[in-house]
Amino acid sequence: GGVVKEAEDVIATLEVRKEAQKYPAELIPVRLSEIYLINEGYEWVVSTVKQELKKDFQGIEEDLEKLQQVIDSGKIGSKKKEEWLAIGITVCAILANEVDGMEWKTLIDGNRETPVLQYKDRTIDPMKLVWSKVKAGEPCNVIEEYKKCLD
């Protein structure tokens, strides 16, 4: 035990979040649950590329071409949100492997708690990289999206 007064002062500053109130999005250090999502999504892409193209996937920039071939084959239905999210996560994983300073974070915005990449003052959301486009009926080019993240 330390000083009770100090603990009471800290506790007095805490605020219980209200149901109907909107809070600003927060970026916190990546948590284990998001690391699990990153690994699960990446492993799904590795096995899908191996299954569909009979090629290895190493998580490097050159692998984006293989990922695009799987997308272009039409094997992933436009309603398969989790699979598209896995592709977005994999593009981010390649960015994290290839670019110094890219760092995984957990985004908490009231609607979801999800892994995102932070680079300098930018946040790269794997869901917005591909799923948002697919959902809107737009074509998905992972090589272009990857290059946009480098600008």
Locations of the language-model features?
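A recognition module on extended beta-rich or small alphabeta surfaces enriched in W/G with H and D/E
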Residues: 8-11, 114-151
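N-terminal low-complexity, intrinsically disordered segments
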Residues: 16-81
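Acidic, serine/threonine-rich, charge-biased low-complexity segments
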Residues: 1, 50, 83, 141-142, ...
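Short, well-ordered coil loops that connect the C-terminus of an alpha-helix to the N-terminus
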Residues: 2, 55, 101-102
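Amphipathic, interaction-prone secondary-structure segments
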Residues: 73-120
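Short coil/turn segments at secondary-structure boundaries
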Residues: 59-63, 108, 145-146
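Generic structural signal for hydrophobic core residues of well-folded globular domains
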Residues: 71-74, 94, 98-99, 133-137, ...
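Charged, structured surface patches that assemble and position nucleic-acid processing machinery
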Residues: 1-14
